[in-house]
Amino acid sequence: MEQRVQLRVGTMETISNEGDVDREQVLETFGIENETGKETNGSRSFDVGYSSGDTLETLPKASKVDISPADVLKTLFFILVWYTFSTFLTLYNKTLLGDDLGKFPAPLLMNTIHFSIQAVLSKMITWYWSGRFQPDVTISWRDYFVRVVPTALGTAMDINLSNESLVFISVTFATMCKSAAPIFLLLFAFAFRLESPSLKLFGIISVISAGVLLTVAKETEFEFWGFVFVMLAAVMSGFRWCMTQVLLQKETFGLKNPFIFMSCVAPVMAIATGLLSLLLDPWSEFRDNKYFDSGAHFARTCFLMLFGGALAFCMVLTEYVLVSVTSAVTVTIAGVVKEAVTIVVAVFYFHDEFTWLKGVGLMIIMVGVSLFNWYKYDKLQKGHKTEEEKQLQAPSQTGKYVILDEMDDQENSP
């Protein structure tokens, strides 16, 4: 009897004989079915058939699936849109929060309003187009509190700490320090078993770390608390993007759509930040502050908050779309390039100091991230071969998964 094994492609995940999962970048599982030519959840699929009399050498040779130019252009478009919204949002935050600029007295209140706008807009969109955005599965309460809530809290802390750091330090200095996010993303990826530690990755981490240290060295306007806040934000950034990738790309959670995901995390972010605002923001000083001391000023403040919330909604939505169609690693790599763009804009807009030492540090960071990008691309092209992947399931047993590139290598070997 001929068995047919259907593999869903576009993602990469293998299951070892011991049941451990070796995740490349994404966590979607392969599907085994007895049908052919079926579209599964919008993913392309193809069949590799073998009969009980086939040996490894007689298995049909699989062809590689290349990334289409349309996919590349779509990704580049979303990255460009993300750059635009992010740059404007950074300028907005610094202009409003800077100690020597707008000096808005309540950064946490501002973020609470922004998160609330994101929650309301995403809920309205998923409700109005409920037929389109209705998830196939409903996330369990256990997964909600164990996975969604920590992701939301990590995202809220990332944004709150980043904005708080802008009160004390320049956009250029904050951006360079925040460029350390890939280091923490890798560390969390190791912890969550999304990546396997290797000498190459530790070397890349060392290069990026050296670049960050050079940007901090001889900083003429060094503010300790600003530095602490922005580095904690980098830690939270690594955590939240690892968790975001898990939630967006694992089908069992039913959060693959960015609008559904945002409608789940944004309310938690708004509530948590609102509680912090009640505790930490100087509410007693609002009446005498230039943002709230008259009706006209209060109306202007409301408009500023709504404008910032719309910018934040568009930027975060673009981030989630990028992660859902690519990976957290892609977003982080594109994010570091975005930081370079932000630095250039800040130097011209805010006249931030940019020394040759900072320039060298920035170049080293870019080299480190480029090396990481090359490492991931090379790994995806060649396939990460392990001993478990090299063992082929006997035909009489229930189906195991076989990496197609590895089948090519074994087929061509003596």
Swiss-Prot record:
Disulfide-bond pairs as recorded: none
Keywords for this protein: Membrane, Sugar transport, Transmembrane, Transmembrane helix, Transport
Membrane topology: Multi-pass membrane protein
Residue span(s) of domain EamA: 106-216
Transmembrane segments: 72-92, 101-121, 172-192, 197-217, 224-244, 259-279, 303-323, 328-348, 354-374
Broad class of the protein's primary localization: membrane
InterPro entries: Sugar_P_trans_dom, TPT_transporter
Superkingdom of this protein's organism: Eukaryota
Intracellular or extracellular location(s): Membrane
GO cellular component, one term: membrane
Family listed: Belongs to the TPT transporter family. TPT (TC 2.A.7.9) subfamily.
Name of the protein this chain belongs to: Probable sugar phosphate/phosphate translocator At1g06470
